[in-house]
Amino acid sequence: MNINATARSLLLTEFVSAFFLAMRYFFRPKPTINYPFEKNPISPRFRGEHALRRYPNGEERCIACKLCEAICPAQAITIEAGPRRNDGTRRTVRYDIDMVKCIYCGLCQEACPVDAIVEGPNFEFATETREELYYDKARLLANGDRWEREIAKSIELDAPYR
């Protein structure tokens, strides 16, 4: 047996070095958070629950161009456009998103020329049935109304990178 190995085993050098390593981390602040009660800040580029936005005058932004429907790789978006109005604009009659199919890639948000469809900051939208994850136009507009302040702030922060 080597004298060096014998000295190491008698003096328990590995044990002592491991003990000091553990003690160094023991007295540091904990990196974990108590999730339901504490939350980390969310990035401005976070992609969560979908929402349809409105203009400040209350009119919906969607112009029924169907670019989001065309670009969606999961084919989760279904849009039906209404007839043209007197001023030449169109609006959607039906705007549905199947959140079960959605892969949250953000391509719909990037394709939209008027920032109508966005992925908001909400990530806590668990449901008990699959049918509740089929969002219609009314629910998407309600999400947009509920999260408008946070959505506008994240779009403003992300503007230099678009």
UniProtKB/Swiss-Prot annotation:
The record's annotation in Gene3D superfamilies points to: 3.30.70.3270
Which branch of life, at top level?
Answer: Bacteria
Q: What is this protein called?
A: NADH-quinone oxidoreductase subunit I 2
Major location (coarse): membrane
Q: Which SUPFAM superfamilies match?
A: 4Fe-4S ferredoxins
The UniProt entry's GO CC annotations, sorted and at most eight, read: plasma membrane
Q: What class of enzyme is it?
A: translocase
UniProt source species: Rhodopseudomonas palustris (strain BisB5)
Q: Where does [4Fe-4S] cluster 2 bind?
A: C72, C102, C105, C108
Its keywords, alphabetically, are: 4Fe-4S, Cell inner membrane, Cell membrane, Iron, Iron-sulfur, Membrane, Metal-binding, NAD, Quinone, Repeat, Translocase, Ubiquinone
